[in-house]
Amino acid sequence: MSKIGLGILTYKRPDYFKECIKRIDNSKINEIVVVNDGTPYDFDVPYHLIQHAKNKGIGISKNDALKYLQSKDCDYYFLMEDDILIKDNNVFIKYIEASLETGIQHFNYSQHGLMNKKPGTEIPNPRTRIDYKNNVSIDLHMHCVGAFSFYTKRCLAESGLMDDFYFNATEHLDHTYTIIKKEMHPPFWWFADIANSNQYLEDFPWSPSTSTISQSNNRSEIIAKSYEHFTKKHGHHILQTPNLPLDQVKEKLKQIYKNK
């Protein structure tokens, strides 16, 4: 029987964290780990806790969660930041079913924040939708958002974990690009999510003032260094990553499907 693991990332937002975990149906998940990258909370955490002694950043925090879940020999891995709320706990099986049908080994929830929504609305704005058999459909979005992510065991085995260099920016973009290069995800700028994912997940009411990363005093410097590292690593600036036409994207999806 397949084993599902969930890693929850939190940083100095006890109220968010409490609401986040309150929405989780433990019967849907085999292993849960919490990584607290900030000061300890003054209440008990009901799951295995990795408490950092100092702020290590989101890249290392996500890796710590994934390493713990790998030690438990999970087959499917989910990472969730503390400002994501579960609306329907069938979300886990929906991502797994989509992976099994399409062959795509990695998905990111697209509807966190505003980047993949129609301007001024909460309506998803995918570049296209692809329909498969067995009532599975996926949406492909322009922007890669890393607040809720799915990986298979195969994906992590072949692509490795996140680059520890990234502190509070770009870690998910770099990792997803690595997975794309392994041909387990559609091309860059066509980021995969299950169709209608906003029926299963939602954001905690968000604004720049509630984002611990957006409020960082050296946010611009962190982003600049992350883009510089990405450029050295991949040979081009992140914004120069090729944006393939839809017909080529569909051919890539066919190849991923054949290799599942």
What residue spans do the PLM features occupy?
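Short, well-formed alpha-helical segments that are part of the catalytic scaffolds
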Residues: 13-26
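A conserved acidic beta->alpha catalytic loop
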Residues: 34-44, 85
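Glycine-rich, basic loop-to-helix element that forms the pyrophosphate-binding segment
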Residues: 53-69
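Short beta-strand-to-loop acidic/aromatic patch adjacent to the donor-nucleotide binding site
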Residues: 74-85
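Conserved donor-nucleotide/metal-binding helix-loop-beta segment in metal-dependent transferases, i.e.
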Residues: 90-106
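Short beta-strand-to-loop element that shapes/binds the nucleotide-sugar donor at the catalytic cleft/hinge
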Residues: 107-122
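A recurrent flexible, glycine/aromatic-enriched loop bordering the glycosyltransferase active site
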Residues: 131-151
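C-terminal catalytic/acceptor-binding lobe
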Residues: 165-260
